Amino acid sequence: MARSFRLASLVAVIAVSSVAASAARAGNVLGSLTTAVVGGNCGATSAAFSPFGDQRSYYFTSDGGFEAGGAGWTFSGGAKVVSGNESFNLHGSSDRSSLLIPNGGTATSPALCFGLLYPGIRMMAAGSGTLNVQVVAHGLLGALSVLDGGSVAVNGGWAPTPVFSTTLSQLDIPVGTKSIQVVLSSTGSVQVDDLYIDPFLSR
């Protein structure tokens, strides 16, 4: 009887160990799949636009608030970092800067992480004109494609843009893409601030 109890206990321990090992392997596989789907480590996410009823999870892009003077960004056509933060202090109450894009100006972000399942791009904007968004997809050997992210009319004070996502899907972004760059341009005069990306355009 005691021998049978010990045998049953041993079998139970082996079964629990097997389940734990399988779970660990599944976790490793899930982590590998996530790494494969996302073009890099996007970092911590938050519901940055929750004050506007948007509960999606976004990560803050590299100098997306332009507090470091646009470090890593490339500006042309008069685009530049100026004093004056977006009025909702979305990223932080200590922020003091934003990006001005005059008519014909462009601003190109550093390489950014993204997800292949409909990445969403959102920011704050103000001014008078049209804000245009393009996405440059990069592979290991350079640019693979330039995609149209859409445009939005900007008229007045600071407000969140729509989520730019409709043409950025796994069908549009080329296989082998490792990172993206966001290219902002305008007709008129537009200010932008606090650029965020939702890697998976979570619902």
Predicted regions and their residues:
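Exposed low-complexity, polar/acidic, P/S/T/G-rich flexible segments that act as propeptides
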Residues: 187-203
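Extracellular beta-strand-rich recognition modules
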Residues: 66, 119-125, 178-186
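C-terminal segment of classical bacterial N-terminal signal peptides
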Residues: 16-25
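Beta-strand acidic-aromatic groove motif in beta-rich domains, primarily in extracellular
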Residues: 75-77, 119-122, 129-138
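Bacterial N-terminal signal peptides that target proteins for export
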Residues: 1-9
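Extracellular glycan-recognition surfaces and repeat-rich motifs
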Residues: 28-38, 50, 59-97
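Short beta-strands within extracellular/lumenal beta-sheet-rich domains
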Residues: 93-120, 130
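Extracellular carbohydrate recognition and processing domains
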Residues: 52, 140-176, 185-191
